[in-house]
Design a protein with these regions (language model features):
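Kelch-like beta-propeller repeat domains
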Residues: 1-307
């Protein structure tokens, strides 16, 4: 597992948004067992290793999405207040080969890329990447209601249909199920948290892509939230944990599982996930039947079965 960029605050000296940006590329092997209290992260490249000539920019709230066995697309993100990068330009796309490591800077407008955005979500299937929503990186707080498909074989960014699509949204989840359905849920839209009774669906297996709303059982729902961790489990269910409110001040500790195979789809709370504590902007990864959680605010590292 590779992790790139983000924010660090070793001495808790900054507010969350003001914490320093970084360009660190880290690696953690998930092929062997390890003690989650001392995870064996390897520092691959970044400002602390100037012997590596190929390095990426400082970034936060971006995405890194693998589209084949060698390369990933870095897209969007905030470069920080001291960066010379213009936040409204369409120049955020980069290619990364983490094994080298090799960062490839691309020209503005490459492959018809859209404007830089942050706090968006991406999901991939069969080499294609879906980029959903996001917030402008210029501090205005404006949200994007335009969503894109990135086809790396051409390469080209293609705007997805707007009819019945998610509105301007950020801090949400985008997950592609084994059957090819893309689900989008949670986050913030119009200054309000999006309730988990809303879930947008796009069947990526169809040649004519069309958005629809999923049917969700209303009897048991997580409280609305943004910036939560989410992961697709091996059995096709989706796990979420933590997150924050619309002001980004709270840090929730509860966890839930969505079963999209049922009609209507159902949410079930998993009490054990509250042991992780409250956190936001963290990650969750499925590793051989267990879920690895890490980082976020507040930050620590944990390993839990998916329940």
């Amino acid at each position: 597992m590779f992790l790139y960029g983000g924010k660090t605050d070793l001495y808790n000296a900054f507010g969350y948004d003001a914490a320093p940006w970084n360009n660190d590329l880290l690696f953690l092997s998930l092929s062997t067992a390890f003690d989650p209290s001392v995870p064996p992260w390897q520092y691959v490249s970044g400002s602390e290793n100037t012997s590596i000539s190929s390095q990426g920019p400082t970034l936060a709230w971006h995405t890194v999405s693998a589209f084949n066995s060698s390369f990933s697309l870095i897209f969007g993100g905030s470069t920080g207040p001291l960066s010379p990068t213009l936040p409204d330009n369409s120049d955020s796309a980069q290619l990364l080969n983490p094994m080298q490591p090799l960062f490839i800077t691309l020209p503005e407008g490459w492959a018809g890329e859209p404007q830089r955005r942050m706090r968006h979500a991406t999901a991939s299937i069969n080499g294609s990447l879906y980029i959903i929503g996001g917030e402008t990186a210029d501090g205005s707080g404006n949200l994007f209601s335009t969503h894109y498909l990135f086809n790396p074989s051409t390469p080209i960014f293609i705007q997805l249909p707007s009819q019945n699509a998610p509105p301007g949204i950020m801090g949400h989840a985008a997950v592609i199920l084994p059957d090819g359905r893309l689900l989008v849920f949670g986050g913030i839209s119009g200054g309000q948290l999006v309730p988990f009774s809303s879930c947008w669906v796009l069947d990526t297996t169809q040649s004519n892509l069309m958005w629809a709303l999923a049917s969700i059982d209303q009897s048991s729902l997580p409280s609305a939230r943004s910036s939560f961790a989410f992961v697709l489990l091996s059995d096709g269910r989706i796990l979420i944990q933590g997150g924050t409110d619309a002001t980004f001040e709270a840090a929730f500790d509860d966890g839930w599982i969505l079963d999209p195979s049922r009609s209507p789809m159902t949410w079930t709370q998993v009490p054990a996930l509250s042991q992780l504590g409250g956190r936001k902007d963290h990650f969750a990864v499925n590793a051989g039947g267990q879920v690895v959680f890490g980082f976020g605010a507040p930050s620590h590292f944990s390993l839990r079965p998916p329940c």
